[in-house]
Amino acid sequence: MVVLLLVLYGGQTIAHAQQTIFNVPTTDVLDKGKVYFELDISAKPNDSDALNKFSSFVPHVVVGTGHNIEIGLNIAGNVQPGADSTTLVPVLKWRVYNGGDNGWAIVVGTHVFIPVHNKAYDVGNYTYTMVQKTFKTKTRVGFGSGFFTKDVVVPNAVRGVGQFTFEQPVTNKFTIASDWYTGKHANGYWTSGGIYKVTKKLTAYSGYSVGNANASKGNDFLLVEIGYNFN
């Protein structure tokens, strides 16, 4: 759960987990009583024309509540160097359709952004719909759309986005994966990399994010995520 990603232009990050690929939500939902924790680390070691060096740490927790619903909390805005822009992000995802053997699934979700320090806005929101199809080859592709309210990812503007995912298991433990938010805004990145199941409970994600804007000027960074299923 980036992406969600780096706080840019007053924007905030969104949830990550295999409740996301890297940044874009999946149609996966935790079973009732299941608890998942993840720490997302974004970093750029050098300055560039488009993006200066930084590091960012975003913890979040997700809990399955039953009835194909999960809830969670992200703590975004911990970016160095820079002013503290801590933002609490309660999240909710509801799987409204699970086709089982036909491979189709649909979720709807929402994230509420509540800035705590150095506020660029009082409260923001991201709502989305995501559709995924799993094929007999275990390939899973997804597409959907989302909407960010004013100031969340662009100053003084709202943003509608397209969102896309791709996953292909290579072994029982390793999957190549990619996701993408369309548009020029704080979450407008394409991220590709791998997902490795270290143990039954521990999963590692590693990817590289390239911006939709100013990619040739160095708008890119490394993303590493560590996820743990408690039960």
What are these model-predicted stretches?
Residues 154-159, 165-167:
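Charge-rich, low-complexity intrinsically disordered segments
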Residues 7-15:
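C-terminal segment of classical bacterial N-terminal signal peptides
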Residues 15-139, 143-152, 167-175, 179-231:
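Transmembrane beta-barrel domains of Gram-negative outer membranes and organellar outer membranes
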